[in-house]
Amino acid sequence: MSLGGSVRRHIAAIGTAIKHLLAPRMTVKYPDVHHVPIQTNYAFDPKRGAALPGWRGRHLLYLDKCTGCNLCYVACENIAEAIVMVTLPEEKRPQNKKSLYPAVDYGRCIPPWTNIVTSDGIVPIRDVKVGDKVLTHTGRFRTVTKVFRRRYTGRLYTFRTLGNIERLSVTEEHPLLIYSRGRTEWAFPQQIGYGSYLVRPVIAEYADPEEITFTYEMYHPSGRGGYFTLNHDSVKCTAELMRLIGYYIAEGHADRYRVSFDIDKKEVSIARDIVAAAKTVFGEDACLRPDGRSEGLKLVIDSVKVASFFSQFGTRSDEKHLPPWALRLPQHLAGELVRAIFAGDGHYSNKYYDYMHSNYFTIRTTSRLLANQLLYVLAGLGIGASACSQDQKHRKTCYSVTVHTPYIDKMAQVCGIEARNNPPYSHSYIKLIDGLILSPVIELDVQNVEDLEVMNLEVEGDNSYVASNQVVHNCVFCGFCVDFCPFYALEMTPDVELSEYRRENLFYTPHELAIPPRRLARPLVNPRFEGERVKHMAGG
């Protein structure tokens, strides 16, 4: 070898070493501290159909023991969705006549801006921490046990479903929960086309609070200056309070010293209800003040305490939102809340045409967060609703939450309006079945991304979470495949670190899982994606 060639090889080796040192890890190290024997690093609860998280590492495959029976694939199906069977013609072994071996995918994630439904509200996944509770496909809130971050290069799938203002973007191997042929099942993005039904759960955990506590600052003048004290107070959680909150979300504004409600002069019944509820709940009088900007009515409550209470719901129209406890109210209280919001910002359309009868309920708001939250509140009342956005020239974007047949009857009962379902002309493609809201895919986009930060969660018990109002699978390697293998061909290491530059390298082929592992000159690609094309057709 020439001197120049030797120098180039040494420089290349040093460059590779530096690149490895500076590159971020694609996944985290298992476990962080604790080490356990291989036999106890997984568990499975057959009654719940869920893999229980534990300490575990990557898979180990004994090629001389694997018979290609597919049992590991069957065990992984609908749990981790990480194993796929691949054919290796060069691996001719007597016990595996088809040369069929398992490969494992270790990388599935979503972008960090994706909104996640947690017990503390709807927040971006970048703000979710270990110990937080997230909504799962069962409608329950379960604890996050791991948070994963990595860089991703590959295809990014983006879905938009009917009645959902949020778009869901996932990497090419991140399973989504769909409803097909009368049941739910996990599907990969490339298997989902136009008309496929994605799902979101109805919140099944309710809390009936007796009272709501809050704090407020009170100013005390003293001499030339003064001082503030932090006071604690509470109000009973009653129907009157829920209606007052609903009126505030629709028509209210709060500053440091007062709360005001701007209503139309014809809405006399609403004005009377606000005055009565303010007196009953807070013991405060609501006075009428002229509104120089319009011919409407302005009801004002001059109270620092009351203003502090209502500030938790947002002070401006585009900032209005419900606190976390309001998403889990029992139906009798949630109904009063929706009734008041509809009275202030709602509309019932009942039109007859020569060819059809069209009727629907709609609530309009400039708060994107509130529109998303109302979908869950209405679902808890047994009402399937849809949300859409409309850009307005020189005005804020408007979000409409709409209810069609077959949910008109229930919405009419909640809002106190005479209305009936219109079965012959149902316009609702949003379905509520078995505690799940189903909505069809209406937009699908696939793009190639490079070095994009993506994230994933590991969720205790249910192994799923709600992202952009759709159920996605979490990251879990439970080891159930190890328990399912009758030939002891699979094991899992108690401690491993996966560190790769590109997404493709996180797909471990049978050779890379083997003992000892070996890389091929031309790595295999996941057969799920080789030569695939996205189907841009209805129901494709």
Residue ranges and their predicted role:
Residues 1-103, 475, 480-483, 488-540:
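Non-ligating segments of multi-cofactor redox enzymes
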Residues 129-474:
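Internal intein/HINT superfamily modules and their associated LAGLIDADG
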